[in-house]
């Protein structure tokens, strides 16, 4: 069985014709001819529709009828259903009739098509009687939207003075309606503000309508654009604002802010320094300000220049040469200001040039003296003293015309040869030698002085170059050292050497040297070549080498100067043994002159000085050793005078209270060695010995007291010996001590009854005293 497709729409009559044609084309009730289809073949069922249409935004009551779906199945058994995202929400179908309804107003601008699936099922079993079929519901557009601009505010710019019709900006408004349906999406633009200077084309392009838009008068404009839909039902429209900024062009000339500029400047202003500025007004933006300043008719363009400051567009006046108050005190000239980069198309009635008068007053400054020349060059003949070599002259450029005093700066030793007078005359004190210094460069100083002769502090310097002129004061000599050799069997006429000459003086091109021998009795002769050279040749031939191995040949050399000078140079010719080919085999050259350089002399002197110092140190050391032996002390004994501070005792003073030699002799059981005969002075040291060991129970403290008393009397009555007092300092001493004072300063011979055994009870600090003054019978050591 074959299905019938039907497309229905309320109010759409033309769809009926389409449905009728479709039904006629596939009508299942048409007769079957014998050759068309087999009688036993079953016809396939199929949908007779696939598309429906409905207008958007319908104002009639809901639901809105869309169309009908129909199947050739027995309608008593069929039930129609819809499947899809919008089924049951936006659309529903009458399950009995197949009518499709819209449940809400549709908006094409939101959804223009809906895709659904139609089902035909059995009413009882709910099983599909036909295969599901998809169809589309298209929403027809109505003109229900007005244009909306892409931006609410637009910004644009255009050069000022632009011609009529110059494009400014393209604005766009969008209509959400279907552009394929009639004129639903067509937009019409118009200006509601700013139409006196601008216009808008149908495409939304804004153009200029005034060619005299001047940025300096008004630089910004506001234009309001309206976009509307002529076919719209509600007559709504959209608006946007356009802000148009005029771009600057160079259409204005600079104008001086003053007609006259006056400046005062000191005459000593440095060349190239700014002395004043010229200001102009140019309403154009900075990038279009290109003012050029120039002198009118070339006035003082050789004295001043005017540079343009690129940041401020001002003219800066600078001197290009020194100013002189005494010569010109005021400068007056005219300056012109113009802009060479201006666009003449925009030039109106404004004058392209603007002029101003400039007056520069030069003020006087106390200036230093000025020499008449930048430098001086004098010539002086060597070997002469001249009272006046040349004069320098400096003047005070100021009106005061102060006096000038001259002096030579002693920057080198060369200046000591010259002097200068108060008037600037230069003279030489000593004769000069051109061969030592051909040039002398002096620095002459000129100072201003007041009426009292006191310098004012203003001074100038100038360089003076003195050239020493040459005179013929040096005799000719050999051009280089010669070491000629000759074979002892040299034949007559054999060339020995060719010599040439030189002169320390300036030798002109026409100088001529004459050569000759001072003696003619030798075996050599000289031939002058008349080209400032000479040949020495063998005169007779053959030499006796055993008789003379070296021949000294004086050569006279004369020049043609005025006066002519003659010098003698000695040529040392060595006689050598030669083989048969004339080759030298044995030569003994002349002994070279022995000389010692200054460096060698200094080295020899330093060596001698070093040797002398070492010798003196050795002698001094030996003398000190002899003095030590004279005092009866050996070197080890002297070293024993060093104090060890970790031992208890009286400190550094103990070193003078005993004789080390005595203690050493006592330690070894011997007596003190005798004094040398040369030591005639009395001993200042006490020969301290511990009393001999006594029998048990015996006490002999009086012997120690007697010894101390004897020594004290000797010291008190010795008139030839110097005073030798010793102060002993102990850690525990005085009235608070058990032993009271132990100092020997207040004791005499009356202490013989003192018992020193109590020192043994005082501990290790007084062990030494206890051993010295105690009478321990068990002690074997003797100090």
Swiss-Prot record:
Q: Which GO terms describe its molecular function?
A: beta-catenin binding; cadherin binding; calcium ion binding; protein phosphatase binding
Q: Where is the Cadherin domain?
A: 44-149, 150-256, 257-371, 372-478, 478-585
Q: Where in the cell is it found?
A: Cell junction, Adherens junction; Cell membrane; Cytoplasm
Q: Which residues lie on this side of the membrane: Cytoplasmic?
A: 621-783
UniProt region (Required for interaction with PALS1), positions on chain? 621-660
- Top-level division of the source organism's lineage: Eukaryota
Cellular component GO terms held in the UniProt record: adherens junction; bicellular tight junction; catenin complex; cell junction; cytoplasm
Q: Which InterPro entries match?
A: Cadherin (IPR039808), Cadherin-like_dom (IPR002126), Cadherin-like_sf (IPR015919), Cadherin_CS (IPR020894), Cadherin_Y-type_LIR (IPR000233), Catenin-bd_sf (IPR027397)
Pfam families xref list: CADH_Y-type_LIR (PF01049), Cadherin (PF00028)
**Per the annotation, which location comes first and is thus the protein's main one?**
other
TM segments?
600-620
Membrane topology value: Single-pass type I membrane protein
GO term, biological process aspect, one? adherens junction organization
Q: Where does Ca(2+) 3 bind?
A: 143, 145, 175, 177, 184, 229
Q: Where does Ca(2+) 1 bind?
A: 56-57, 107, 109, 144
Post-translational modification, briefly? Phosphorylated on tyrosine residues by KDR/VEGFR-2. Dephosphorylated by PTPRB.
Q: Where is the signal peptide?
A: 1-25
Residue ranges in the Extracellular topological domain are 46-599
What keywords are annotated for this sequence in UniProt?
Calcium, Cell adhesion, Cell junction, Cell membrane, Cleavage on pair of basic residues, Cytoplasm, Glycoprotein, Membrane, Metal-binding, Phosphoprotein, Repeat, Signal, Transmembrane, Transmembrane helix
Family matches, as SUPFAM superfamilies? Cadherin-like
**Quaternary assembly:** Part of a complex composed of AMOTL2, MAGI1 and CDH5, within the complex AMOTL2 acts as a scaffold protein for the interaction of MAGI1 with CDH5. The complex is required for coupling actin fibers to cell junctions in endothelial cells. Within the complex AMOTL2 (via its N-terminus) interacts with CDH5. Interacts (via cadherin 5 domain) with PTPRB. Interacts with TRPC4. Interacts with KRIT1. Interacts with PARD3. Interacts with RTN4 (isoform B).
Q: What is known of its domains?
A: Three calcium ions are usually bound at the interface of each cadherin domain and rigidify the connections, imparting a strong curvature to the full-length ectodomain.
Q: What is this protein called?
A: Cadherin-5
Q: Can you name the source organism?
A: Bos taurus
Highest classification ranks of the organism: Eukaryota, Metazoa, Chordata, Craniata, Vertebrata
